Curated annotation (Swiss-Prot):
Localisation per UniProt entry: Nucleus
Region Disordered, annotated ranges: 1-58, 75-95, 226-304, 544-563, 865-1002
Keyword list, A-Z: DNA-binding, Metal-binding, Nucleus, Repeat, Repressor, Transcription, Transcription regulation, Zinc, Zinc-finger
Originating organism: Caenorhabditis elegans
GO CC list: nucleus
Transmembrane stretches, start-end: none
Name of the protein in question: Suppressor of presenilin protein 4
Annotated GO MF terms: DNA binding; DNA-binding transcription factor activity, RNA polymerase II-specific; zinc ion binding
Inducing factors: Up-regulated by oxidative stress.
InterPro entries: Zinc_finger/UBP_domain (IPR050688), Znf_C2H2_sf (IPR036236), Znf_C2H2_type (IPR013087)
Primary subcellular site in the record, as a coarse category: nucleus
One BP annotation, GO: regulation of transcription by RNA polymerase II
Length: 1311
C-alpha cells in the first residue's frame, strides 16, 4: 500500500506486534469473548452466534482475500435477505463473517450519513455518538483527512478503513457495484496487482419489477497506464482545505423498500433522474496506524455528474398556486385567488351607508374607518383623514350615481322636513316624559289649593288628581310618550303593559277593605304587648326627638345619670310621660332619683366633694361642665310640678296621656294617617305608663326571704342572675317545642312539661276571675275567657289548652273535629295529620291537665274509626268488641251446620269438638285442639304462674318472625283478646261463658304493620330504573339515584352490572346482593365461562353484549349467567381487599360530662326512654300496657323476658316525677340485683332508710305543697314542720319522715 519501504527496525517490530495482536483478537472472537458488547456503539461489534464456531482451533483455516465479485455477490445475497426479513441478523452486522472477509472490510450502510466523513449509520443515536468524535478536544489518535479523533487505536483503525473504502468525502448513498465485464475483470486484476483495492458496498435493493439505473464509470487502459506511472501525491492535512460535498440524492425516511403490491409504473425521464445515483470519489489511506500514513494514489478527475433536484408535493403546490388565475374585482384593483374572498369584497361595493373610498371610480364602503385604510392601499395613494361617512341620501352616493339637479333638490327638501317632524315629536315626548302624570303645580286661589297642569303653558286647574290625569291623557296625549305601557290607571296614573296587569293593580290598590280594629287586636295578642307597644310608639318618639341624644361623658363615675337626665330640647312634662322606670331611691339634697341604692349613694357622695364645676342650686359638683348642665335641669320645674299634683295615681296617668295626645297631634299634618292609628298609639302609651316593666327583661322578687328575679314573660323565678339570663335566652331562640302561653322554646318535652306546670299554678289562681264564654263564628262556642287585663287567658272547653291570644284559641279549636284525621288524642277529640302537633298536644295534657290519665296518640282510618294496635288489646272496649264479634260468627256457623245436618243436633249443641270445624271447607283459619289449663296443684306450688311464653320471650335469641314454636316445644298462643284475657287472669263476663277454640296463628309486629299498610293505602315501593333497588320513600330513592350519576370524579368502587359507584367496598357489596337475588351461580362453571367468547348473533335478532369483556349472546339466560360470573369475581376481589386491610383501631367514645341527646330524638311519655329510630320507639310503646308475665314497678311496662323488664327498671326510670313509694320500690329492686350494695352496719333483713334510697337512686325529694326540694328526708320533715304544718295529713307524713320510713299513700315526689 505504501510507496516508500520501511527501513527502520522499530516499524518492523511494530508490525509484528500488531499481527500478534490481531491473531489474539481473532482467537478471542472465535471463542465468543466479545459477545456482550453494546449494540448502540456504532463502532462496536455485534453478538456472534456460538453455533457457527467449532471448539477445536485446528480446524480454522487462514484467511483468504476475496475478489470484488465475491464480495459484491455476497453483499447482494445479504441485501436480498434484508428485503425479505426487514431485520438485520447478527452475522450481517459482525466484523468477521465466516472468517473469510479481509481484515479491512467494514459495513457502512444506513440512511443517516455524517457530513464530515463517509460514515453511515442505521440510527440517529449512533450518528450522534459518531459526531461527538469530530467535535471537542483533540484526542490521542486523530485522523489526518478529517477532524475525527479517538482515544483508542481500534476506533481510529475502523475510521481509516471507512476512508480507504469509500473515499475522503462523505458518501451520499450506498455505492452500487458496476456490472462485471471482461474489461472490468482485467482492470480489477491490474489494480489489485498495484496494491490499490477498489471495494464497493452493496446498493439498497429496489422494487423487483422496477428497472435499476446504474451509472457506471468506464476506465480505459490508457488511463490505467498513466495511473500506474505517476506517483501518488503526499496529502498534507495543513494544505488541504475543506472537501467539497456533493449534494446527496433524497433518501426515503423509513428506509423501507416499496410495497410488493404496488403496480409496475412506466419509466419516465423524471423517474430515471431520481433513480440515478452518483458515485462518490474514492481516496486511499495507509493501512497502519496514524504515525505511518501514506497518501492515497492520484486518480483521474471524473466529470461531475449533473445534480437533479427532487420535486416534492410542496413544490408542486407552490407552482400550481403561481399558475392559478387570480380573480379580479371589476370596480377596484382588488385581486384574490378564491371566489369567497371576492364575494366578501364585493359586498363592500353594495353597502348603502358607511365610510366611502375617496377614489373617483371606486364606490367601496365599509362600516369602520380602519378597514378603509387597508383598502386604500390598493389605490397607491395617501388616504385623506378622516374619511367621509355617507348615508342613504348622502351626496357621495349621488356622485357615484349621477342624477339631475332637480331631483337632488327635491330629495334634500324631503329630508329636511322629515328631520323637523322628528325633532318636534322628540320634544313633545321629552316634555310629556318630564311632566309626569301625578306631578302638578300648586296654585292657591281664594285660600283654596288647586292643582295646575305643568305641561307647557296649559292653564288647567283642578282639585282632584283623577281629573288632572284624565286631562293630560285627553288633551296632551300622554299615552304616546310611553307606547310600551298602553294601559293607564286614571285613578293614580299607574302604567301597565297589559290589561291583566292593570286589572290586578286596581284589585290590589283601589279595592282594599276597611281595616277593622279586631284584626289589630288579634295581632297584639299574637305578637305580645311588649313588641306591639314598641312598634307603634317608635314613630312618635322619632317625631318628638328632633336631635338624637348624645352620650354624656361623666368622669365622676355616675353611670345612672345618663339614663335619668333629660335632653335639652324636650319639655319636662313630655320627659316625665316617656319615663318608663319606676324610681325607688331619692337623694335627700336634690331631686335626683335612682333605681338602685348603690347609684343613689354614689350620687349622694358627690355633694361633699369639691370638684371644678358646681351646681348653682345645690352642693353637687362634677369635673365635667356638660354633666353639671344636665344636673341643673332637674331643679326648677320638676320640683314645683310635683307639689301641685294630686295624690291619686289615676289622675297622674291621665294627665300624662293628655300631654302625649298633644304631642301626637302636634307634628306636621299627615293626610294619610287615619284616626285608627292615632287611637292605637294612645292605647299603647297608656299601656306603657301602666306597665313600665315592659322594657325590662326581669324584675325583682323576694324568694324565701332572699332577693331574687322573676321573668317578665312567664312565672319563672330564680335567686341567681345567671340562671335568669340563660332562661331569657329560651324566649329568644327558636327550638323544637314551644309554650302556648309565652315565647319559651326547648328541645326537650320534659322541660316544656315542667315549664307548663308553672303556668298551670298561675292559671288556677285566676280561674274564677270574670270567666266568660267565648263565642265566635256564627254562635260556635270554643272556650272560656278568664282574668282581666294583662293576666287575661283563653281556655279551650275540650282540653286543657290555654293561650293568651283569641286567634290562637280559634285555630286550635278547629282541630277538635267530629271526624278525626289519622291521629287522635286518647283524652280528647283533638286530631291532626302532623305527628309533631300530636306530640305537642300530649305535652299540654301532661303539663296543664289535672288528674288526667296519661295521654297517647291513637290511629284512625279515613272514616274516623280507630285502628287497633298492640297497646289497645288490653282495653275493655276491645275485649267486648272481640267477644261480640266471635259470638256472631259462632251463631252463623251453627245455623249453617244445622241446615246441613238436621239429624246430628247433639254434635252441633256440644260445640267443643274440633272435628266439626275441620270438616268445613269454607273456614280458612287454622284450628287446633284446646290445651288444658295449667293446674298449680299438679306441679306443686311456685311463685310464678305457669303459662306459655310468647315469641317475645326469645326475640333476642332467634328471629321471632320465623318462629313457629317457643322454647317449651308447644305452639305459641295467639294474641287474640280471649287469650289475652286468660293470660291476664280475667275470669267471668261474656268471654268466660262462651267456649272458644284456640288459634295457633302467630301475630307479630311486622305482620300487623304489613296488614295495616295493605288495608289503608300505603304507597307502593318505587323501583330504581337502573338497578333492582326499591324504596317506598321518594327521598331515599333520590339519594340512591345520586350514586348512579358521575358528575364529579368517578368513585373508586363501581358495579359490574349497572352504573352504581360508591366510595366504600362494603356499600358496593350491599348493592351487589340486589343483583344476585334469584340468580344461581355454579362455581364449577368458572372455567367454561372464562374461555367462552360468545355466540354468533344473526342479523335482526336482539343481542346482549357484556360491557366487561367481548362476550355476546342472543339468549338472555346465558347473559345473566355470564354477568353473574363477573359479579362473583368482583365480590371475591372486594372480600380479599377487605381481609388484607390493616386492622382498625377500635373507636372509643369520649366520656362526656353531660348526656348527649339528638335533636330528632323521640321521648316516651310514661318513662324516660328516648331514641332516634322510629321502629325502636314503636316497639317500646307497644310494651307499655301489654299485660305480660313480668311487669315494671313504676309504670305499665311488661314483657315475657325478665331481663328486658330489669333493664327497663334500671335505666328508664331515673327518678322523674315519681312518688316516694315508687322510689323505694326501684331502690329495693336495685338492692336485689346488686346495683346498690347493702350497708355494712345493716343486716340482710333490715331495710335501708329512705335517705339511702334517695341518695343511691340519684333523686331529690320535693315538697308536695311548694317548690322546695332536698336530698335527705329529715330536712324535708323539718321544712314541712315549719312551713306546712297546717296542711292535711302533714303531721303523719312528718312523723314517718323523721323515723326514716316510707309514708303510706305518700304524695312526696322527686325532681
Amino acid at each position: 500500500m505504501s510507496s516508500e519501504p520501511t527501513s527502520s527496525i522499530e516499524s518492523d517490530n511494530l508490525r509484528r506486534s500488531k499481527r500478534k495482536k490481531f491473531k489474539l483478537d481473532f482467537v478471542a472472537a472465535a471463542h465468543g469473548n466479545n459477545q456482550k458488547k453494546s449494540r448502540k456503539d456504532p463502532h462496536g461489534q455485534g453478538d456472534d452466534d456460538d453455533d457457527t464456531f467449532d471448539d477445536d482451533l485446528n480446524h480454522f483455516e487462514p484467511l483468504s482475500v476475496l475478489t470484488e465479485q465475491d464480495v459484491s455477490m455476497e453483499m447482494f445475497e445479504d441485501d436480498e435477505e434484508d428485503t425479505v426479513s426487514r431485520r438485520r441478523t447478527r452475522r450481517s452486522t459482525a466484523h468477521f463473517q465466516d472468517y473469510q472477509e479481509p481484515d479491512r472490510w467494514i459495513e457502512n450502510s444506513g440512511p443517516h450519513a455524517c457530513h464530515k466523513c463517509p460514515s453511515r449509520y442505521e440510527s440517529k443515536s449512533s450518528l450522534a455518538n459518531h459526531t461527538k468524535m469530530h467535535l471537542g478536544e483533540k484526542r490521542k489518535f486523530a485522523c489526518e483527512l478529517c477532524d475525527f479523533s479517538a482515544s483508542t487505536l481500534k476506533s481510529l483503525t475502523h475510521h481509516n478503513n471507512i476512508h480507504q473504502n469509500f473515499g475522503v468525502l462523505s458518501q451520499q448513498t450506498s455505492p452500487v457495484i458496476p456490472v462485471a465485464s471482461s474489461a472490468d475483470s482485467t482492470l480489477n486484476s491490474s489494480i489489485n496487482s498495484t496494491g490499490c483495492q477498489i471495494n464497493a458496498p452493496p446498493a439498497p435493493k429496489l422494487d423487483e419489477e422496477a428497472p435499476i439505473a446504474v451509472e457506471s464509470v468506464v476506465v480505459h487502459h490508457e488511463d490505467v497506464a498513466e495511473f500506474d506511472t505517476t506517483p501518488p501525491p503526499i496529502l498534507e492535512r495543513e494544505d488541504d482545505g475543506p472537501p467539497v460535498l456533493i449534494r446527496e440524492a433524497p433518501v426515503r425516511k423509513s428506509n423501507r423498500p416499496m410495497k410488493p403490491t404496488q403496480k409496475a409504473q412506466k419509466m419516465t425521464k423524471q423517474r430515471e433522474r431520481k433513480s440515478k445515483t452518483v458515485e462518490s470519489p474514492k481516496g486511499s489511506l495507509p493501512s497502519s496506524s496514524a504515525s505511518s500514513v501514506t497518501p492515497p494514489p492520484v486518480r483521474k478527475d471524473v466529470e461531475k455528474p449533473k445534480i437533479f433536484v427532487k420535486t416534492t408535493k410542496k413544490n408542486l403546490k407552490k407552482t400550481m398556486k403561481i399558475t392559478k388565475v387570480r380573480q379580479r374585482c371589476p370596480h377596484c384593483p382588488f385581486t384574490t385567488s378564491t371566489v369567497t374572498r371576492l364575494n366578501r369584497h364585493s359586498g363592500g361595493h353594495k353597502l348603502k351607508e358607511g365610510y366611502i373610498c375617496p377614489s373617483e371610480n371606486c364606490n367601496f364602503m365599509c362600516r369602520k374607518a380602519g378597514f378603509l385604510q387597508k383598502h386604500y392601499i390598493l389605490h397607491k395613494g395617501t388616504l385623506p383623514w378622516p374619511p367621509e361617512y355617507v348615508k342613504k341620501g348622502g351626496a357621495k352616493m349621488k356622485r357615484t350615481f349621477p342624477e339631475s339637479e332637480e331631483k337632488k333638490i327635491e330629495v334634500t327638501e324631503k329630508v329636511q322636513k322629515m328631520k323637523k317632524m322628528h325633532k318636534r315629536r322628540a320634544n313633545t315626548v321629552q316634555v310629556v316624559a318630564k311632566a309626569q302624570l301625578k306631578s302638578y303645580i300648586k296654585v292657591e286661589v281664594d285660600d283654596v289649593i288647586f292643582k295646575k297642569c305643568n305641561i307647557g303653558e296649559c292653564e288647567f286647574l283642578t282639585q282632584t288628581l283623577t281629573q288632572l290625569i284624565v286631562h293630560k291623557v285627553k288633551t296632551h296625549d300622554t299615552k304616546t310618550a310611553f307606547p310600551q305601557h298602553r294601559f293607564l290607571c286614571l285613578t293614580c296614573g299607574h302604567r301597565a303593559k297589559s290589561y291583566a296587569a292593570l286589572r290586578t293593580h286596581k284589585l290590589i290598590e283601589h279595592t282594599s277593605t276597611h281595616k277593622r280594629f279586631h284584626r289589630t287586636y288579634y295581632l297584639k295578642e299574637c305578637v305580645g304587648d311588649k313588641f306591639f307597644v314598641k312598634y307603634n310608639l317608635s314613630k312618635v318618639q322619632e317625631e318628638v326627638k328632633e336631635e338624637p341624644k348624645e352620650a354624656d361623658g361623666d368622669e365622676s363615675g355616675d353611670e345612672s345619670f345618663d339614663s335619668m337626665c333629660p335632653a335639652s330640647d324636650v319639655h319636662p312634662e313630655t320627659l316625665a310621660a316617656i319615663e318608663m322606670k319606676d324610681v325607688f331611691f331619692c337623694c335627700n339634697m336634690c331631686p335626683y332619683k335612682a333605681p338602685t341604692m348603690n347609684r343613689c349613694q354614689r350620687h349622694y357622695d358627690k355633694h361633699f366633694k369639691n370638684d371644678e364645676f358646681k351646681c348653682q342650686y345645690c352642693s353637687w359638683s362634677s369635673r365635667s361642665k356638660e354633666v353639671i348642665v344636665n344636673h341643673e335641669k332637674l331643679h326648677p320645674t320638676v320640683v314645683v310640678a310635683n307639689t301641685n299634683e294630686a295624690p291619686v295615681v289615676k289622675n297622674e296617668i291621665e294627665a300624662k296621656v293628655e300631654v302625649l295626645s298633644k304631642t301626637v297631634s302636634s307634628p306636621v299634618e299627615c293626610t294619610e294617617e287615619s284616626s285608627l292609628s292615632k287611637s292605637i298609639q294612645l292605647w299603647c302609651q297608656r299601656e306603657k305608663l301602666r306597665h313600665p316593666e315592659l322594657d325590662e327583661q326581669f324584675t325583682r322578687k323576694m324568694i324565701d326571704g332572699v332577693k331574687g328575679f322573676q321573668c317578665t314573660d312567664c312565672p319563672y323565678t330564680s335567686k341567681y342572675r345567671g340562671d335568669m339570663r340563660s332562661h331569657k335566652k329560651r324566649h329568644d331562640i327558636e327550638q323544637l317545642y314551644r309554650c302556648v302561653q309565652c315565647t319559651y322554646t326547648t328541645n326537650r318535652p320534659v322541660s316544656l312539661k315542667d315549664h307548663l306546670k308553672q303556668h298551670a299554678i298561675v292559671n288556677m289562681s285566676i280561674a274564677d276571675i270574670k270567666s266568660r264564654r267565648v263565642v265566635v263564628n256564627q254562635g260556635v262556642k270554643i272556650g272560656m275567657r278568664r282574668g282581666v287585663g294583662k293576666d287575661k287567658i283563653y281556655c279551650c272547653d275540650k282540653c286543657p289548652y290555654v293561650t293568651l291570644a283569641l286567634g290562637c284559641l280559634w285555630r286550635h279549636h278547629r282541630n277538635h273535629r267530629d271526624t278525626a284525621k289519622i291521629n287522635i288524642c286518647s283524652n280528647c277529640s283533638y286530631s291532626s295529620i302532623d305527628q309533631r302537633k300530636m306530640e305537642e298536644h300530649t305535652i299540654i295534657h301532661l303539663g296543664l291537665g289535672l288528674n288526667e290519665a296519661v295521654p297517647f296518640v291513637k290511629r284512625v282510618d279515613q272514616k274516623g274509626r280507630p285502628v287497633s294496635s298492640l297497646t289497645d288489646l288490653n282495653s275493655e272496649k276491645m275485649n267486648e268488641r272481640k267477644s261480640t264479634k266471635r259470638k256472631m260468627l259462632d251463631k252463623v256457623e251453627k245455623m249453617e251446620v244445622g241446615e246441613d245436618e238436621e239429624d246430628d243436633e247433639e254434635s252441633v249443641d256440644k260445640g267443643t269438638d274440633d272435628g266439626d270445624y275441620k270438616q268445613r271447607p269454607e273456614k280458612k283459619r287454622k284450628q287446633s285442639s284446646e290445651e288444658p289449663a295449667s293446674d298449680p296443684e299438679l306441679f306443686g306450688s311456685s311463685s310464678q304462674p305457669t303459662r306459655q311464653l310468647s315469641e317475645r320471650a326469645t326475640r333476642n335469641r332467634i328471629n321471632y318472625s320465623l318462629l313457629s314454636k317457643n322454647g317449651s316445644g308447644k305452639p305459641t298462643p295467639s294474641t287474640s283478646s280471649a287469650n289475652l284475657e286468660k293470660l291476664a287472669g280475667s275470669s267471668g263476663g261474656a268471654s268466660s261463658e262462651s267456649p272458644e277454640p284456640d288459634e295457633s296463628v302467630e301475630v307479630s309486629h311486622w305482620k300487623i304493620r304489613t296488614f295495616l299498610r295493605s288495608e289503608y293505602g300505603v304507597k307502593e315501593s318505587l323501583k330504581c330504573p337502573d338497578c333492582p333497588y326499591k324504596s317506598s320513600e321518594p327521598d331515599v330513592l333520590e339519594k340512591h339515584r345520586y350514586y348512579h350519576m358521575t358528575k364529579t370524579t368517578p368513585r373508586p368502587y363501581a358495579c359490574s352490572d349497572c352504573t352504581f359507584n360508591t366510595y366504600t367496598p362494603t356499600a358496593l357489596l350491599q348493592h351487589l346482593k340486589l343483583h344476585s337475588e334469584g340468580v344461581y351461580f355454579d362455581p364449577m362453571v368458572k372455567k367454561h365461562m372464562k374461555h367462552r367468547k360468545g355466540d354468533s348473533i344473526p342479523p335482526g335478532v336482539k343481542g346482549y353484549y357484556c360491557k366487561n369483556c367481548s362476550f355476546k349472546t342472543s339468549i338472555h339466560r346465558n347473559f345473566i349467567e355470564h354477568s353473574a360470573y363477573h359479579r362473583q369475581q368482583l365480590i371475591n376481589r372486594i372480600n380479599i381487599t377487605l381481609k388484607r386491610q390493616p386492622p382498625r383501631i377500635e373507636y372509643q367514645r369520649p366520656k362526656l360530662k353531660h348526656q348527649f341527646v339528638a335533636k330528632n330524638a323521640k321521648y316516651c311519655k310514661k318513662c324516660t326512654f328516648k331514641c332516634v329510630s322510629q321502629s325502636n320507639f314503636i316497639e317500646h310503646l307497644d310494651r307499655h300496657g301489654w299485660n305480660q308475665l313480668y311487669k315494671c314497678y313504676s309504670c305499665d311496662y311488661s314483657d315475657n323476658t325478665k331481663s328486658v323488664v330489669d333493664f327497663h327498671q334500671l335505666n328508664h326510670h331515673i327518678v322523674k316525677d315519681q312518688t316516694l313509694h315508687s322510689i323505694c320500690q326501684s331502690a329495693k329492686f336495685r338492692l336485689e340485683n346488686g346495683v346498690i350494695q347493702i350497708p355494712e352496719f345493716q343486716t340482710e333483713k333490715s331495710k335501708p332508710t329512705p335517705d339511702e334510697f334517695v341518695s343511691k337512686t340519684r333523686g331529690l325529694l320535693k315538697c308536695p305543697s311548694c317548690e322546695y326540694f332536698c336530698h335527705v328526708s329529715s330536712e324535708l320533715a323539718f321544712h314541712m314542720s315549719v312551713h306546712h304544718l297546717t296542711e292535711p295529713n302533714a303531721r303523719e307524713t312528718i312523723s314517718y319522715l323523721h323515723m326514716g320510713l316510707v309514708p303510706p299513700k305518700a304524695t312526696v315526689t322527686t325532681v
